[in-house]
C-alpha cells in the first residue's frame, strides 16, 4: 500500500532502527490466491513440434538456405515421373483428393408444389425460372456449395432456414451424393514438390541453389501407432549445382543437427533404395547426442538423373530430409508420437508443483484488516497450542466495517488443549498425493520429497474464521467458529480444483487431509 514518505524520513532521522523494523507495516497482506505457489508468472507452453520446427527453420537460414513453400497437391503422373515402374506400389501409401459431385437437379411440378406447401404460399411468377437458373449455376460451379442455401433463398424469396428444410425434403439427391476421387494426391514426401519446383527454377537462379521447406506430408498408414502418424512434418532441403556430391549431404546434416546438441555423426548406406535417388547415394544419418546417444535422425541422397530429366533439370541435386516428429521425440524423450503431437487428446500429466496451484481456500476475509487479523490469530494460536483448557487468549483487536472487534482463540471444554493435534498440519503434494502432515519424524520424507502448498490447517481455519467474523461485523454482531475433526478438504476450508481432483482419482493417488483440528475462534463487538 502507499505510505507516508515524510513520516519515514523523520523516523529515519530520529530512530533508524525503528524505521527499518516498521517496514513490513506498509505491506498489504495478500489474498491466499496471491501467495506462492498459487500466485506465479505462468509461461505459456509452446507445442514441442512447432518449437522444433522453429528451431529447424532458424538453423537452415543460419546456414544460408532460402525458405520455400513446396506444392502440396501432386498429380498422379508426377509420382510416375519420379518413381518410374515403382510408382504403382508407392501410390498405395498416398491419399487421393476427392469430393462430392454436383448433381443435375430437375424441377418437376410435384417438387414445385412441395416447395409451395413448405413456404405456405403459391410460388410467385418467375420464381420457377429463378430457381432453375440457381441450380444450373450451382451445377456449373459458378458459386460454391456453402453459398447454395443463400442463393436459393434469394431465388425463392424466403429465409435460409426454410431453404435448409426444402433441400432436406424436396431434393433428397443432395443427401445421397457419394464422393468421387480425382487423380490428384496429397504429397507423401517433400521430394514430389521439389521436382516440380526445380523444373521451374533450376536454370533461372545462380548456382548453387540452396532451399528448404518444413511442412506437412500425408501418408496412408494402415493405422497410427506410437511411431507413425497419417500426417507428419518433414524438414527437407535441396542443394542443386554442377559440383554437388554426397559430401554435400554430410556437411548439411552436421551443420543442421549440431544446432540441436548432436556432436558426432555417422553415415551409412540406407537399405531402402528409392528410385528417385542415384544408386549408392541414399544415406542414413546417425547423430550422437550427449543425453540420448546414437540415434537415426535424417536421410539424404542425390536425385537420379533419370528422374530429373523428366522435369528438364540438368544438374545434380542433393536432397536431405528428416521427420520433425522423430526429432522432437528424441529431444523430449517422448515414447508416443500421438501423445506428443495431440497432447490435448490424452490425460494430462501434472508435476507436484502444478498440482499445488490448484489447492486454495474456500473462504477468506475480504479486507486488509481481516487478513492482518488472520496472521494475529495464527501467531496467538501457535504460541499457546499446548495450553490446557479451559483457556482463552486474546488474538486481535481492531476495526472491521466500522465496528471495534475483539477476537480470541479459546477452548471452553475441560481437560484438553487449545488446539487439536492436527491443527498445525501443513499441506504437501508428493508424487501426486495431497497430504496434510504434522512436523514429525514419521512424515519427514513427505516434507523432504514433497512440494509445500503454503497452507496449514491453522492458516485455512483462521481464514475461515475471519471470513465469518467479517460477515458478522457487517451487521454489528459477534460470532464463534469451531472446527473439530477434518474428514474432507471442506472441513478445514480447503478447495481442491476439479482438474486436481480428476488427476488424483484418474491416477489412483491419495487425498488425505484428515485429523483432529479442534479449534475455536470467537469475536465480539466492543
Curated annotation (Swiss-Prot):
InterPro entries per record: aa-tRNA-synth_II (IPR006195), aa-tRNA-synth_II/BPL/LPL (IPR045864), O-Pseryl-tRNA(Cys)_ligase (IPR005246), Phenylalanyl-tRNA_Synthase (IPR002319), SepRS_C (IPR041590)
Kind of enzyme, top EC level? ligase
Q: Which gene encodes it?
A: sepS
Organism of origin is Methanocorpusculum labreanum (strain ATCC 43576 / DSM 4855 / Z)
Catalysed reaction, written as an equation: tRNA(Cys) + O-phospho-L-serine + ATP = O-phospho-L-seryl-tRNA(Cys) + AMP + diphosphate
Q: What is the lineage of its organism?
A: Archaea, Methanobacteriati, Methanobacteriota, Stenosarchaea group, Methanomicrobia
Family matches, as HAMAP family: Sep_tRNA_synth
**Which keywords belong to this entry?**
Aminoacyl-tRNA synthetase, ATP-binding, Ligase, Nucleotide-binding, Protein biosynthesis
Please identify the protein, giving its name as recorded: O-phosphoserine--tRNA(Cys) ligase
Family according to the record = Belongs to the class-II aminoacyl-tRNA synthetase family. O-phosphoseryl-tRNA(Cys) synthetase subfamily.
Which NCBIfam families does the entry mention? sepS
What Pfam families does this protein map onto?
A: SepRS_C, tRNA-synt_2d
The record's note on quaternary structure and interaction partners says:
Homotetramer. Interacts with SepCysS.
Could you tell me the EC number(s) of this protein? 6.1.1.27
